[in-house]
From Swiss-Prot:
Gene: rpo10
InterPro entries documented for this protein: RNA_pol_su_RPB10 (IPR023580), RNA_pol_suN_Zn-BS (IPR020789), RPABC5/Rpb10 (IPR000268)
Protein name (Swiss-Prot/TrEMBL): DNA-directed RNA polymerase subunit Rpo10
Organism encoding this protein: Pyrobaculum arsenaticum (strain DSM 13514 / JCM 11321 / PZ6)
An example Gene Ontology biological process: DNA-templated transcription
Cofactor(s), names only, from the UniProt record: Zn(2+)
C-alpha cells in the first residue's frame, strides 16, 4: 500500500529511498545496481523495496460504508 518508512526487520529508514529507486528502475536501470548505489546491502531492506506494490490508488476509489 504505502511504502514503509523503515525496514520491517532491521529498522533502517527506507521511505526516502523509494522515489529514487522507482525513478531509476523505470528509467531502465537494473534494480540490483540501484539498490547497491543507494547503500542497501541487507537483503531484508532490498526485499522491502523490491517487493513493494503501490495499491493505494486502487484502494482509494472504493467508498467506505
Amino acid at each position: 500500500m504505502i511504502i514503509p518508512v523503515r525496514c520491517f526487520t532491521c529498522g533502517k529508514p527506507l521511505g526516502h529511498l523509494y522515489a529514487v529507486f522507482k525513478q531509476r528502475v523505470l528509467a531502465g536501470e537494473h534494480p540490483g545496481k540501484v539498490l547497491d548505489d543507494l547503500g542497501l546491502v541487507r537483503y531484508c531492506c532490498r526485499r522491502t523495496l523490491m517487493a513493494h506494490v503501490e495499491w493505494i490508488d486502487d484502494v482509494l476509489i472504493y467508498e467506505k460504508r
